[in-house]
């Protein structure tokens, strides 16, 4: 009898334990943060997402959801490249043996904070899939001190080479380069960083940012890739035709990009270097002649449109995921009847999983500006009065310091069937219309930018021609003899920066007061 009672008690305890574990797991699962992850590529969401292209009044053609989701997913961790002599002991050996590891593991993420931290990893580690290379020549160059020093490259304070990444795969260790963080991190003189802020090219920056570009350029050429996160491997045509297919605007009879067809590699490199003085990169469908500075991602959650020319709506987190996918591996070159690619051009055959893009977007939404060192003193208070008096708030409306509306590019007459989604101020501030009218990213509009964070952003106006607030409010910038602090056309020492003349009539004292106020935002 005692034996039967003991067995019964043991079974009862086992059942109780199992029930307790089940209840505990159920409770933990009920407390788990379960995000509602939208589909990145959704045909219904894509239908009215883009703004029609100026001069054609048609939206760019996007690949279908079926084609997008047929791309294989890529979910690999990457590791920093250390400057020779700064690599930790055993690091290279570790890379040879660690094997491929997942960039994001959704099943391990139980809180919103976990997802945001996973998004930071995507932001920092996700690489440009089209630039990943196993070529031993490039891998050796990335580990060769003399080769790096010939490019004037220097390590960051932690000993790493900015933007370069190692990728352990099933085929060995590849060299690649950062995707998001290459452009959307600003380094301060002390080596600290502002995630989400655009890099500067006229202020202190990682000494190895652009001097190290020769290695990236060599990889791009070897893989038949145009700069600016191109989602394609170009065909067998000469480099000039690659450029035309990346940037040409055939529906414009005065298309400046026609001249690219005969460019040599050296001519391309010269023009590309000049365009980078804007604080930006000529993205696919953008322009080497009408550059766009890298935008600030801090505060993007409150922005209604994406890109300087409002190429796409920002209606929800799904749109930010969609845009990240678009510019990384899903862009096209089809505009109505105009199909820009050659028959032997190949799309990058990879994409990030939806979970990675969702985590990335969450992280970007979470970004905060650094502590503002500028005091709200009497000078700044006087500047706030001037800001209100001059009517600046009509466009740069507090608290976001943007109305989230669009202004007309100089000379643009909107069509009669403007989509209802566009909130347009029927005014033009007179800035250079090239990006908005002469490129495939041209919509005819410029969005009103937020003034929040102008103290750290640097490079003003959409083309980054203005390098400081002092230059922005200097009446002399309107003169042909002006020497821009930022972008200027190739081989031009002087260049007038027209448009947005608000505040130029103020006297010197009032200008300084207004600038002091703007720096507190």
Where are these regions (language model features)?
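Bacterial N-terminal signal peptides
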Residues: 14-21
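Bacterial N-terminal signal peptides that target proteins for export
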Residues: 2-13
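Periplasmic c-type cytochrome electron-transfer domains
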Residues: 28-521
């Amino acid at each position: 009898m005692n034996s039967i009672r003991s067995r019964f008690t043991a079974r009862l305890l086992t059942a109780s334990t199992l029930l307790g574990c089940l209840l505990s797991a159920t409770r933990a699962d009920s407390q788990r943060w379960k995000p509602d992850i939208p589909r990145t590529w959704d045909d219904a969401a894509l239908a009215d997402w883009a703004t029609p292209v100026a001069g054609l009044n048609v939206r760019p053609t996007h690949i279908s959801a079926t084609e997008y989701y047929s791309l294989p997913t890529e979910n690999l961790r990457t590791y920093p490249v250390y400057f020779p002599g700064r690599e930790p002991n055993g690091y290279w050996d570790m890379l040879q043996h660690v094997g491929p590891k997942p960039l994001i593991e959704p099943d391990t993420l139980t809180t919103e904070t976990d997802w945001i931290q996973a998004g930071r990893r995507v932001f920092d580690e996700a690489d440009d899939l089209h630039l990943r290379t196993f070529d031993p020549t490039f891998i050796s160059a990335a580990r060769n001190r003399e080769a790096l020093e010939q490019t004037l490259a220097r390590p960051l304070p932690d000993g790493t080479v900015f933007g370069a990444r190692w990728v352990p795969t099933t085929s060995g260790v590849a060299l690649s380069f950062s995707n998001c963080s290459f452009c959307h991190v600003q380094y301060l003189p002390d080596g600290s960083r502002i995630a989400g802020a655009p890099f500067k090219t006229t202020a202190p920056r990682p000494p190895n940012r652009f001097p190290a570009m020769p290695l990236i350029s060599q990889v791009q050429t070897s893989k038949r890739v145009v700069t600016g996160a191109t989602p394609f491997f170009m065909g067998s045509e000469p480099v000039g035709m690659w450029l035309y297919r990346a940037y040409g605007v055939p529906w414009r009879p005065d298309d400046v990009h026609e001249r690219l067809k005969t460019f040599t590699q050296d001519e391309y490199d010269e023009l590309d270097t000049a365009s980078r003085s804007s604080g930006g990169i000529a993205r696919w469908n953008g322009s080497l002649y009408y550059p766009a500075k890298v935008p600030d991602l801090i505060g993007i959650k409150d922005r209604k449109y994406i890109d300087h020319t409002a190429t796409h709506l920002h209606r929800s987190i799904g749109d930010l995921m969609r845009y990240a996918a678009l510019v990384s591996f899903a862009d096209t070159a089809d505009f109505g009847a105009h199909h820009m690619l050659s028959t032997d051009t190949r799309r990058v055959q990879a994409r990030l999983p939806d979970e990675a893009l969702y985590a990335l977007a969450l992280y970007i939404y979470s970004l905060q500006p650094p502590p503002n060192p500028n005091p709200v003193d009497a000078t700044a208070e006087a500047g706030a009065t001037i800001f209100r008096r001059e009517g600046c708030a009509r466009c740069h409306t507090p608290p976001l310091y943007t109305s989230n509306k669009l202004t007309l590019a100089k000379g643009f007459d909107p069509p009669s069937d403007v989509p209802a989604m566009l909130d347009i101020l029927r005014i033009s501030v007179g800035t250079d219309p090239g990006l908005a009218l002469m490129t495939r990213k041209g919509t005819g509009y410029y969005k009103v930018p937020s003034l929040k964070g102008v103290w750290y952003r640097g490079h003003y106006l959409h083309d980054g021609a203005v390098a400081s607030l002092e230059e922005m409010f200097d009446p002399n910038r309107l003169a042909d003899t002006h020497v821009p602090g930022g972008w200027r056309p190739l081989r031009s020492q002087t260049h007038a920066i027209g448009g947005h003349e608000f505040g130029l009539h103020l006297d010197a004292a009032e200008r300084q007061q207004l600038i002091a106020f703007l720096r507190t935002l």
